[in-house]
């Protein structure tokens, strides 16, 4: 027989592959039909303890087993069966009860049963209030969904927007925060949510709160109405308005611990202690020093308090690693700090409520609430960072005496068992003097302390529950002294909006609106010449606290409205003194700024307005800001110096008492010293005595000068006498002596010329027209008169005549 052809064999192979694909597709469809049938037959009210008892797909079961999830918690056993059937769910359970898996497993299963692929677009959207919680949910999703073929993405702020845009259109499951999700819905053209099947809100009561109200409403407008919605939180909302906004259809309320005697885990030991506000830092430092081998979370009201306490205690070196986390940090820093605290065995982290919800830090021993939480729900979420998954944990709440009664009522209403403890005085450590020393040596730390003080006072003032938070019952002066400040900063409180609306408003939206309004109002500045002095004043220190320092001492802060409409997140409102007074239309107080010739005519129009702003404290008289010229005046340090009071010069007497340079007496003091004639006579006597003393001093000075001159003359004469002793003496010549000996000893003019000639430079060479006679005439002219002796002197008269000629 002839061998079979090669073409026929290839056709058989390709046909076998097609048959294998077809069989696999049929097998998958059969499995899906069985799975769907099992889900339909599932009894949602049945008690299920293990994941293996649920009708789950193979990839999900493998992912759960690989992640070591085998047993269901209470909330999972009740919520997962309902979610698999496609029901809308309102889930409420204690912190650390496994709510994350209760919605992630149904998300994977429902998309798997619908054969969801990359081409189908976005199938599930999971929204969390904070970035850290979104990252944690995404990591759990990656673990249990590792065997699925879905594409999942994490959309949070602080990351590259362009990279997210490029990948967003291919995602099947998204974990996000509200702000960044809304930004992509408005700006990313390739992002489509029309096929969305499931919407999950983790920590739903926080997301539906007024802080995210605008963002969530805008997101819901983009989403389709036909979808499955699940809400999970430890403190679930039941407001009809919130549920109507989400378009829930016959939602199932799952509250496994609603009938429990406590809203917190039973393994959590909860205590509170009454500590006056000025003593809180001392108590906290003593507590940290006593628990160096523990893992501690300390909650505070604001990020500025977190910064100040961290920077202060870091210098004191308590003996345990310190970390701090707040919402104003960069995303990379927040991730780094979160991972460090999670992996550490013993450390202390100072944080705001940004870590109060959902985050799962392993093995947290203590949760310390340095500041009173705004409500009982916030307290429950804060203490939920410890005692998770049945483990033991401890929590301590520091309460001011004015906060004790009201807060205990709120906790009792929420079924929170808490016991009072007393702190021994010897367990606290007084760090007041050390903080004062640090603030004195480091001005930037002092200004950061002022910002922390203002931020805390503002947070108390803006709280809605006045039964707990009353700014008048708090010792602000003592608190300022306890954090090292020389005195309490002056704060002018203004009426603000609702506390949560102000506190939880998105900062990005506030900043963008402020920038837009500034750009509309302020015209573009002209290009001006910048001198070296301008650059010198624009320099700033690049320190870790330089930003806080510059904000506290900035004198060119833009003025804000005084009707309470300014941004409540800014602290400058509380540090400035402003009021509104009527100003006459004919006010002409612009004398200082008449040299500004390049101002427009609309400045004068603005000056005729019915109202003006009055600023006190800069000069002796209040400054009325009723025109644009006056507003520009506030930005010029040179012009403000003209308005400030000039200093007065003082002189100090021998005892150190200050006096004015010119002090005038009144009439009574003058008469007390006597009549005018008596004072005149007394003045003349004093002046005469002063003149006599001055004469004596002058005479003594003259005598001293004469004596000094006489001593100098005597010294000079004595020096001359010494020279004369060395000179030659003239005596009568005897018969044996040569009469020419004296004259021969005297120097002759020729010798002097020879001596001088030795010191002079060499003569220049003669020219061709010069001869010796010319040289001799020049020498004779220079030497002057020369005595020529024709014959040698023989008698004494001849010698005397020769000597007289030489001497003359």
UniProtKB/Swiss-Prot annotation:
Comp. bias regions, Acidic residues: 564-573, 584-605, 720-739
Gene Ontology molecular function: any one: RNA helicase activity
* InterPro entries in alphabetical order: DEAD/DEAH_box_helicase_dom (IPR011545), Helicase_ATP-bd (IPR014001), Helicase_C-like (IPR001650), P-loop_NTPase (IPR027417), RNA-helicase_DEAD-box_CS (IPR000629), RNA_helicase_DEAD_Q_motif (IPR014014), SPB4-like_CTE (IPR025313)
Per UniProt, ATP binds at: 93-100
Q: Where is this region: Disordered?
A: 1-20, 491-535, 555-620, 654-795
Fetch the SMART domains from UniProt.
DEXDc, DUF4217, HELICc
Q: Where is this motif: DEAD box?
A: 202-205
State the compartments where it is located: Nucleus, Nucleolus
Q: What is its EC number?
A: 3.6.4.13
Q: Where is the composition biased (Basic and acidic residues)?
A: 519-535, 670-705, 767-778
- Oligomeric and partner information: Interacts with the U3 and U14 snoRNAs. Associates with pre-ribosomal complexes.
Quote the PANTHER family the UniProt record gives. RNA HELICASE
Q: Which family does it belong to?
A: Belongs to the DEAD box helicase family. DDX10/DBP4 subfamily.
| Name of the protein | ATP-dependent RNA helicase dbp4
Instruction: State which gene encodes it.
Output: dbp4
